[in-house]
């Protein structure tokens, strides 16, 4: 049976996070500042504003995703970027345990979940 990208609602996302999945917010820094981030999330920008893969993404991502079985939870604003990235991580890289927040942080907040303020590191 082929591996597919897991879909998760905010409620399912919380359960997967409790189960030890690594949570990665793949948005850009200005988005983290605007909406905040999900508590416990790693912040690793995946795409530039023009849609290119960010030059630092692979190094930062694979420092967390040590092997194909690493449980990963991705989220972005609406789920579009994470769907594209998650499918690539499964189909091209060979990861086997990747989920994404299907409708992104927009749905997370609409569902009444809170975010933590993001503080730039530099």
Where on the chain are the PLM-derived regions?
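Short, surface-exposed ligand- or partner-binding patches at beta-edge/loop junctions that are enriched
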Residues: 75-76
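Rhodanese-like catalytic fold shared by cysteine-dependent sulfurtransferases
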Residues: 1-21, 29-71, 80-122
């Amino acid at each position: 049976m082929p591996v597919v990208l897991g879909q998760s609602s905010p409620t399912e996302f919380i359960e997967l996070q409790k189960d030890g999945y690594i949570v990665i917010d793949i948005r850009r820094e200005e988005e983290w500042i605007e909406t905040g981030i999900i508590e416990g999330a790693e912040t690793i920008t995946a795409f530039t504003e023009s849609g290119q893969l960010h030059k630092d993404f692979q190094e930062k991502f694979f420092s967390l995703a040590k092997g194909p079985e690493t449980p990963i939870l991705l989220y972005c604003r609406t789920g579009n970027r994470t769907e594209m990235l998650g499918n690539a991580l499964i189909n091209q890289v060979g990861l086997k345990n990747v989920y994404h927040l299907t409708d992104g942080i927009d749905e997370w907040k609409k569902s009444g979940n809170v975010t933590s303020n993001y503080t730039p590191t530099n």
